[in-house]
Amino acid sequence: MIEFVYPHTQLVAGVDEVGRGPLVGAVVTAAVILDPARPIVGLNDSKKLSEKRRLALYDEIKEKALSWSLGRAEPHEIDELNILHATMLAMQRAVAGLHIAPEYVLIDGNRCPALPVPSMAVVKGDSRVAEISAASIIAKVTRDAEMAALDGIFPQYGFAQHKGYPTAFHLAALAEHGATEHHRRSFAPVKRALGLAS
C-alpha cells in the first residue's frame, strides 16, 4: 500500500460514500472537517463499528466537527450517469455544502472528483484517516436511516435488514413484487425484474 502522508494544511476535509452497491436508494456521501481542539476518540471505518457505536459517534461528530455536509445522487441520476459518475457528483455536492471551505480534501478510494481545491484519494482511507472515518460514519448512519424509513413504506422488500444490497431475500422480493420507484433501473437485477434485461 502506498505510504500516506497527511497534508500540511489546517482545514482538511475527509469524504466517503455509502451505497454504491445497493439496488435501491441514493448513493450518500459526507464531507467532514474535524476540529483538532476537540478530538473524537474511536473513529474507524463505519463498517467495522457496531450500530450503537456508530450512532454515538455520529452525534459526537455532528457536535464537534468544524463543518460537515451530506451530498447525494438519487436513483434517477445513477441511472442517467452510471454509479461511478453519480458517486463523484455526490462527493462534489458534499464538499460544496461545507460552510467552511477546506484547504485540502482527502477522499476514500482510488479516484477523486473534480474539486476547486487540492485533493488526494486514499485507499482504505476510512480506516487510515480520521476525517474520512468521520465522513463514513455520517454517510452510513444517514443512509441506513433512509433504508429503515423506506422499509416502513415497502416492508415486503426487507430494506431495513439488507440496506438495499442484492441479497437473496431482496432478489426474491424483486422477482415477486417488481421494482419500486426507488430502485436503480440501470442495475442488472432490477432490469431483470422489470423485464428489461437483454
From Swiss-Prot:
Lineage: Bacteria, Pseudomonadati, Pseudomonadota, Gammaproteobacteria, Enterobacterales
Cofactors (names): Mn(2+); Mg(2+)
GO biological process: one example: DNA replication, removal of RNA primer
Main localisation: cytoplasm
Cofactor: how bound: Manganese or magnesium. Binds 1 divalent metal ion per monomer in the absence of substrate. May bind a second metal ion after substrate binding.
Species name: Citrobacter koseri (strain ATCC BAA-895 / CDC 4225-83 / SGSC4696)
Keywords assigned: Cytoplasm, Endonuclease, Hydrolase, Manganese, Metal-binding, Nuclease
A Pfam match: RNase_HII
InterPro entries membership: RNase_HII, RNase_HII/HIII, RNase_HII/HIII_dom, RNaseH-like_sf, RNaseH_sf
Subcellular location: Cytoplasm
Domain RNase H type-2: 10-198
One term under GO cellular component: ribonuclease H2 complex
Binding residues annotated for a divalent metal cation, in chain numbering: D16, E17, D108
Molecular function in Gene Ontology: manganese ion binding; RNA binding; RNA-DNA hybrid ribonuclease activity
Record-listed E.C. numbers: 3.1.26.4
Protein name as catalogued: Ribonuclease HII
